[in-house]
Swiss-Prot record:
InterPro entries: UPF0358, UPF0358_sf. This is UPF0358 protein lin1058. It comes from Listeria innocua serovar 6a (strain ATCC BAA-680 / CLIP 11262). Belongs to the UPF0358 family. Pfam families: DUF1507 (PF07408).
Length: 93
């Protein structure tokens, strides 16, 4: 039984990481092709995606699939990557 829980924990972390990567890719495409970071549509998409990921993390935490610190680390890492992407985008324009 313990092995099954460990497998689910690892699977949960991997799925959350995939979702974070998907958000980063979505924002990158949006910055490259569609809008400027100051655009309300850009901010709305980013806020919505980050909120959705935070709810997924909260759900996984409540189920005991991940530790709260793992969730915080995932959000923090994504925020840093998005910030670097934003800075890169602004330096190109």
């Amino acid at each position: 039984m313990a092995n099954k829980k460990i497998d689910h924990r690892e699977e949960a972390i991997e799925l959350l990481k995939q979702d974070a990567k998907r958000i980063l890719q979505l924002i990158k495409v949006q910055m490259d092709n569609l809008t400027l970071p100051q655009c309300p549509a850009y901010e709305e998409v980013l806020d919505t995606q980050m909120y959705g990921l935070s709810r997924e993390i909260n759900f996984a935490t409540r189920l005991g699939l991940i530790e709260p610190e793992e969730g915080k680390k995932l959000i923090s890492t994504l925020e840093k990557e998005l910030s670097a992407l934003h800075e890169l985008s602004m330096s190109k324009k």
